[in-house]
Structures are given as C-alpha cells and as structure tokens.
Amino acid sequence: MSNNQILFERAQKTIPGGVNSPVRAFRSVGGTPRFVARAQGPYFWDADGKQYIDYIGSWGPMIVGHVHPEVLSAVQNVLADGFSFGAPTEAEIEIAEEICKLVPSIEQVRMVSSGTEATMSALRLARGFTGRSRIVKFEGCYHGHADSLLVKAGSGLLTFGNPTSAGVPADIAKHTTVLEYNNVAALEEAFGAFGDEIAAVIVEPVAGNMNLVRGTPEFLNALRALCTKHGAVLIFDEVMCGFRVALGGAQTYYGIAADLTCLGKVIGGGMPAAAFGGRRDIMAHLAPLGGVYQAGTLSGNPIAVAAGLKTLQLIQAPGFYDALTAQTKRLADGLAAEARAAGVPFAADSIGAMFGLYFAERVPGSFAEVTKSNVERFNRFFHLMLDEGVYFAPSAYEAGFVSSTHDDAVIDATLAAARRAFAALAA
C-alpha cells in the first residue's frame, strides 16, 4: 500500500471524506488523492516522494510558483514580529493601496480571509446599499459556499431558485435568481421582469469552476448597462481570475468597471487572504461608517499580507504577463495539437495564466455546453497524466493554472507526456 493510500485511510477516520475541501477527494476521477509533502517552483512531491508538474498551484494563488524566494523572505521577515494582532497595521494600508492602484474600479477595499467571505460580504453590502433583496447569479459560476449562492435555477425564469446543498433553507434560496451564462436575451428578460428588485448581479467574468469559460464582451457589457439602468450593483467575482488574466484582472482585460470586486488567491500569495472593494460611496455603508456589518478576527493577518503584498509587487515586473500568457497559450495549443494528431476529440483554451481542457469538439460558452464534454475520457486522461507525473485538476469542471516558473522545459515535458496519454486514449 502506498503512503498516499495509508494517509487517505487515516484521514477518513477524523476528517469527513478524508479532505478539507471536496474536490481533493478524487471522487470525480476515482483513485487515491495525492498527499503533498512539499513543493518548489512548478513542482510538488507527494507522500511517496514522486514529483509532479503542478497545474493547480493551490487552485490559483501560486502565480510566481511555489516557495518563491522573495515571498518566502517577506514572510520570514514578519514572523518574529507576531502572527496576529487583532489591530490595524501599516502593512494593511500598503496592500490596500497596491490593490486600489492595480484595479482602477476599486476606490476602497477591505481584507478578509477567504473568497467565500469576500462574496458573502459584497452581497450583504449590495443589499444594504440598495435596500433590495434579490440576487442574480449564473449557472456554472461558483462564488463560495454562502447559503444564498448555493442555488440552482428553477424550472423557469420567474421560478424561485432551488438550493443545491442540503442545509440551505428555501426561504434563503428564493431570493436568488439563476440565469444562463453568456445569454444576453435571458439577462434582458430578467431585468425587464424584475429589474427594480435586483440588489446585485454577481458574475465570474472569466469562469473557472465549470472549467474555463470566458464571458463574452457582449454579455459583460450588457450586464454593465442593465445594472446601471436599474440601479443594481454589479459585482465581479475575480477571486480566481483577478491578477490571473491580466495585471488588473478581467476588468482591465475587458475594459469594464464593476461596482464591487471580490479578490482572493493571488492576493494572499498562498496564504489565506481575500478582499472585496469598489466604489467609495458603496464601501461607505460598511461598519464602522455605515450600517452594514462585516468583521473578521484574522482579516488583514500580517503574515498573509506580507506574502500577498510581495506577490503583487513581483507580478508588476515588465513583461511578466506577456511571458506568462504566451507560455499558457503554448501549453493549451500544444495539448490541442497532440490530441488532434492522435485523433482524439478535444479542445483547449487559455486566457492570461488560466487554461481549460475539454474533451469536446469545441470550446464551450456555457455550463450546458460544458456538461456535454466526455467526462469518462477526461478521467482516463487525468490518470494517464498523473502516472506521467503531471497533475491537472481532478475534475473535468475545473480550470488549470500556469505559473511564471513553468518554463519551456516544463511545458515540453507536459506535451511529451500528453502525446503518450492521447495515444493510449486513441488505442
């Protein structure tokens, strides 16, 4: 029995499912999860000592690679000063100033400890600001596990939303309307029917939890125009795509300003940190200035802030995003070429340092299209690549991530492994 198997059996005795986040359990792909012992650059090593090329990167934060020496030094420099204070620090101001500088639509920002806290707080703030209750979200977009966001579409446009998780009261779910991603007609119909009831529309401008699906410019511009017309707050959930698709996130990529923005992952540099921010007049409704309560014991934790601030400084290096985008595109295009050569139906896409792999004829534009992918074939491909020492997301419905340490040799090794994997699939 491998060390990974031993650890997984042991973990299941004291941790539900043996993991602290469901996707890690390998339920989608089958087999035994890899327990990570250490990581460096684009690699990690599991409990059996096997090395893997890592295309998850802690689900996005590790944009400069694992244990970057400057990030490590920044963390080490603050450790001796104290782990947490429950009081303001100068470093909190510095990271807030950096975020406001990099994301033009953010005039003020508040730190929290997780992406779920960021989206949950942004929605509460939007409701407090507008005095309305209804939220609009989109099928396939993931915004954390707050009750009001674990909702799927009802049977028709005006039907109340239905909870997607046990433990979510129907009375909460009914305030959330779920529409199809990238469907402008459905969006216009919804605003025509109840636009003046909508407190906020929350969207991933580049979705990463139904695999990678880009928001179309037409869709995102329609969102901006309709929210402005009806006085609804437009919330861009950039927890995943923020500082991933461009230095200023999806908003600078598309040239669209949100009213509120949720950030995470990269801004913590691998530590638990997230944030939400936006227009000053909206943020002024937060306590202690306004009546919308939000708080957190570890918000602005000095260790997380040190890691995040150094990461934000590193990604501003000249040419950083040009090189990262080119390398990610090389990976995606190379995988598609290898599949084509083997005669395996497959498509790939990339934007910035995010990529998507689809066992389908074309790149999907909605959740319904994503679900038509051949999941069984993906699962086989995942395990073939895992055996080759390449670690993709253990689910057909997750995006992948490239770091600045994924150099030509790493990409070449990945494509060589993929060539063998696609050949096995085609056999």
Curated annotation (Swiss-Prot):
Q: In which pathway does it act?
A: Porphyrin-containing compound metabolism; protoporphyrin-IX biosynthesis; 5-aminolevulinate from L-glutamyl-tRNA(Glu): step 2/2
Q: Which residues form a coiled coil?
A: none
Q: Which residues carry this modification: N6-(pyridoxal phosphate)lysine?
A: K265
State the top-level EC class: isomerase
Give a Pfam family name.
Answer: Aminotran_3
List the InterPro entries hit by this protein, alphabetically.
4pyrrol_synth_GluAld_NH2Trfase, Aminotrans_3, Aminotrans_3_PPA_site, PyrdxlP-dep_Trfase, PyrdxlP-dep_Trfase_major, PyrdxlP-dep_Trfase_small
Please give the catalytic activity noted in the UniProt record.
(S)-4-amino-5-oxopentanoate = 5-aminolevulinate
| Keywords from the UniProt entry | Cytoplasm, Isomerase, Porphyrin biosynthesis, Pyridoxal phosphate
Main location per UniProt? Answer: cytoplasm
Q: Name one GO biological process term.
A: protoporphyrinogen IX biosynthetic process
Where is this gene product found?
Cytoplasm
EC number(s) stated in the UniProt entry for this protein: 5.4.3.8
Cofactors demanded by this protein: pyridoxal 5'-phosphate
What molecular function does GO assign, one term?
pyridoxal phosphate binding
Q: Which GO terms describe its cellular component?
A: cytoplasm
Tree of life domain: Bacteria
The yes or no answer to whether the keyword Isomerase is present is yes
What NCBIfam families does this protein's entry cite?
hemL, PRK00062.1
As for family, the record states: Belongs to the class-III pyridoxal-phosphate-dependent aminotransferase family. HemL subfamily.
Q: What is said about its interaction partners and assembly?
A: Homodimer.
Protein name in UniProt:
Glutamate-1-semialdehyde 2,1-aminomutase
